[in-house]
Amino acid sequence: MTQQTPLFAQHQASGARMVDFHGWMMPLHYGSQMDEHHAVRRDAGMFDVSHMTIVDLHGARTREFLRYLLANDVAKLTQPGKALYSAMLNASAGVIDDLIVYFISEDFFRLVVNSATREKDLAWIVEHAAAYGVQLTERDDLSLIAVQGPNAQQKAQSVFDDAQRDAVSAMKPFFGVQAGELFIATTGYTGEPGYEIALPNELAAEFWQQLLAAGVRPAGLGARDTLRLEAGMNLYGQEMDEKVSPLAANMSWTIGWEPSDRQFIGREMLEIQRTKGTERLVGLIMTEKGVLRNALPVRFSDADGNMLEGVITSGSFSPTLGCSIALARVPAGIGEQAVVQIRNRAMPVTVTKPVFVRAGKPVTN
């Protein structure tokens, strides 16, 4: 049986096309995915992301536990509210999930994990938390609204109260603060500035309506996917999964290698992969007609003339660039050109860094 978020009626009232997304009825779009995409790049849009799983961890040894559980190192989190992005690995260094962790206080950290991986994530965390005496609380009493775009923070602040505006006035990216009933974080999944706001379920509908009145446009899963793809942000199950190393998913920057004596789950295999080398994640741009799609093969010749093959992990038309883009996992040794087989045609593509748009502007690779 599919679940509904507390904002289901608001989506229907705005004419959303609803789809089943990992057991949740979620808006795909509200009439025009393209217009919603441009609204976020140029002004402000909002997404219902209440299907995401918020988990609060409590206990005196919570930091110690997370230093073992996560590949990134929460020792970096010294200022209350600071957040970081991390992979949670299995013993084979495959990615169980990617998540954001917030440091609230020394005995209180908050995780936000993916909805599709909820059950296995919770089971994995509970299994390893027991030895540290860490208590886990799933916050299904909270909704989550992401307000994103160059004008998103200004428009969101117009519906905050004075204390909430003061709380976020000088907040840097990747921080979160509890301000009254709202937990406001400067995080997102679009490559634009904005907030992700957790609030009690019973307040979500009214807050959504206030944002709507402030000129924030609702946006669905379709625009969320093209926005994150342009920004070069991974989607679990496509760029990485339990069989893919973070080193092959452009996530090396999220691994806390130092101090070298910190033992975290997956480290031993990760060190081997680091030495031997792995596949890598690259960007692809195709200016000819056609659309790069998931699972299409990517072929290229290496410096020795050997023909090698990788695969597109995410592909779509880019509304901002006006052409097709993709992320692809390929063997090391790829140059600046490759071909993608689309039906019976070998289409030339340019190989780039795995990011296409930053702050609303095309990235020059």
UniProtKB/Swiss-Prot annotation:
Which Gene Ontology CC terms are recorded? Answer: cytosol; glycine cleavage complex
Q: Which GO terms describe its molecular function?
A: aminomethyltransferase activity; transaminase activity
In Pfam terms, one family for this protein is GCV_T
Tell me which UniProt keywords the record has, alphabetically: Aminotransferase, Transferase
Q: Does the keyword Transcription regulation apply?
A: no
**EC assignment:** 2.1.2.10
Keyword GTP-binding recorded = no
GO biological process, alphabetically ordered = glycine decarboxylation via glycine cleavage system
Catalysed reaction equations from the record: N(6)-[(R)-S(8)-aminomethyldihydrolipoyl]-L-lysyl-[protein] + (6S)-5,6,7,8-tetrahydrofolate = N(6)-[(R)-dihydrolipoyl]-L-lysyl-[protein] + (6R)-5,10-methylene-5,6,7,8-tetrahydrofolate + NH4(+)
The residues that cross the membrane are none
Q: What class of enzyme is it?
A: transferase
**SUPFAM superfamilies xrefs:** Aminomethyltransferase beta-barrel domain, Folate-binding domain
Quaternary assembly:
The glycine cleavage system is composed of four proteins: P, T, L and H.
Provide the family line: Belongs to the GcvT family.
Tell me, what does this protein do in biology?
A: The glycine cleavage system catalyzes the degradation of glycine.
Fetch the PANTHER family from UniProt: AMINOMETHYLTRANSFERASE, AMINOMETHYLTRANSFERASE, MITOCHONDRIAL
Protein's recorded name? Aminomethyltransferase
Q: Which organism is it from?
A: Erwinia tasmaniensis (strain DSM 17950 / CFBP 7177 / CIP 109463 / NCPPB 4357 / Et1/99)
